[in-house]
């Protein structure tokens, strides 16, 4: 195993585009209110793992998937993660982590984030894509630090909605 630093170094050195498939999380979160069941994801997961071994990662957990599995689907989100890990052993599994909010809708104590990240890493998450809706890095810091105590990778993301190429853009620019 390369470890997080070795993984990041290898990624920076490669020339091929690294593709992340977000359909296991974002596609049905955005289009179907996250109502795709685990059994349906498991029907395609081994096929994808076999046909697309070069895929950089599969974002399959986090965001609303945790909450919806419990409240609306009557499923165990941890069982979903474990089964996807078994079905795609050759893929980097990725999750979306809401910084201090973890997978909830309100900030949690640091100890909760630490325990959640440790369990998610142990269950199969290789890459944690960490963000904060207000781009507050201080709100992302507990999650980043928690991931750094595991052998998983912390992929920190900033969110924006604007046109970087618009000459009138004053907030987000390429300068």
Predicted regions and their residues:
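Flexible inter-domain linker/hinge segments
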Residues: 1-13
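Transmembrane beta-strand segments of Gram-negative outer membrane beta-barrel proteins
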Residues: 14-21
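Conserved, mostly hydrophobic/aromatic
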Residues: 19, 27, 130
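Conserved phosphate/anionic-ligand binding catalytic regions in large, soluble enzymes, centered on
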Residues: 22-33
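N-terminal phosphate-binding or glycine-rich loops at protein starts, especially the Walker A/P-loop
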Residues: 32-40
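Catalytic domains of carbohydrate-active enzymes, especially glycoside hydrolases
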Residues: 40-64, 118-127
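Active-site beta->alpha loop and helix N-cap motifs at the rims of alpha/beta catalytic domains
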Residues: 62-175
